[in-house]
Regions:
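Conserved BB-loop
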Residues: 30-59
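Donor nucleotide-activated moiety binding/catalytic core segment of transferases
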Residues: 55-72
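Basic/polar, acidic-poor N-terminal "presequence/leader" segments
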Residues: 1-23, 183-186
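Short, aromatic/basic amphipathic alpha-helical patches
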Residues: 15-29, 110-123
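Long, low-complexity, charged/polar intrinsically disordered regions in eukaryotic proteins
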Residues: 116-168
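Short amphipathic alpha-helical interface segments
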Residues: 165-203
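Short acidic, S/G/P-rich loop/turn micro-motifs used as interaction or catalytic elements
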Residues: 9-16, 48-52, 74, 78-81, ...
Length: 204
C-alpha cells in the first residue's frame, strides 16, 4: 500500500521521527501468491518526487499525493507539516485516512494546531493521534509500533481500470507495480506495451 509520510524536511540518515517511521514501515513484509514476501508499504516522500521546475505548485502536488495514498502519516515536527496538517484535516477524504504523531508537550496545549486540526481529527477518531516525548520514547512505544504495523498490514482493495478513457492514477500505479513484479527486469516500453495488451487498451 501507498503511505504518504509527512514531517521535517527529508535528509538522508538524519535521526528524526519521520525517518524512523519510514524505516519502520519499510521493514513490514507480507506474503504474496508466489511463495515469497514483498515489502508491505511503499512510502511516498514528497521531496524525492517534486521537481523544482514543475509547473504545478507544491501544495497541489502534495494534495495529489495525499489523494492517491492509502494512508497519510503526519509527524508534526516543523512549520511545513503544520500547514499540511491543517490542509489535509479540512479535506474529508484525506482526513479519514490521516494519522498524526504529535509531541506531548504542555506548552502546546492551547496552540492553534492542538485546538484546531488535531482536536478535530481526534473528535472523529481518537486513535488517529499518537503522542510522544521524543524519538527514543517512540522507539519503545507499544502504541506506536502497534498502529504502524496496523497501517502497514491493513486490508487493501484496489479498483480495476477497465476503461481507457478514465484511468485512475492510484489503480494504475498498483497495476503497473504488478507487471513489474511479475516480469522484472523490464523496461518502460515493455511495461507500457504489456499494460495496453493486458487491458486491451489502444492508449490511456
Amino acid at each position: 500500500r501507498l503511505i504518504f509520510v509527512c514531517g521535517k524536511e527529508w535528509v538522508d540518515n538524519e535521526e528524526t521521527i519521520r525517518n524512523y517511521t519510514i524505516r519502520t514501515l519499510r521493514k513490514c513484509r507480507i506474503a504474496n501468491h508466489y511463495g515469497t514476501q514483498n515489502e508491505a508499504v511503499l512510502c511516498i516522500i514528497a521531496e524525492k518526487l517534486y521537481v523544482q521546475d514543475l509547473s504545478e505548485d507544491i501544495f497541489s502536488f502534495e494534495k495529489m499525493l495525499a489523494e492517491i495514498s492509502d494512508r497519510i502519516i503526519i509527524v508534526a515536527e516543523s512549520p511545513g507539516t503544520f500547514c499540511e496538517l491543517g490542509a489535509f484535516v479540512m479535506d474529508e477524504d484525506c482526513r479519514r485516512k490521516t494519522m498524526v504523531i504529535n509531541e506531548d508537550n504542555a506548552d502546546y496545549e492551547n496552540s492553534f494546531i492542538t485546538k484546531g486540526p488535531i482536536k478535530k481529527l481526534e473528535s472523529l477518531n481518537e486513535s488517529s493521534i499518537i503522542r510522544h516525548n521524543g524519538l527514543e520514547r517512540i522507539k519503545n512505544s507499544h502504541e506506536y509500533n502497534f498502529k504502524v504495523q496496523e497501517i502497514a498490514k491493513a486490508p487493501l482493495t484496489i479498483a480495476i481500470n477497465d476503461n481507457a478513457g478514465s484511468v485512475e492514477l492510484k489503480s494504475l500505479i498498483y497495476e503497473l507495480a504488478n507487471i513489474v513484479e511479475l516480469f522484472q527486469p523490464v523496461e518502460y516500453f515493455e511495461i507500457e506495451t504489456l499494460y495496453k495488451r493486458l487491458k486491451d487498451f489502444e492508449g490511456y
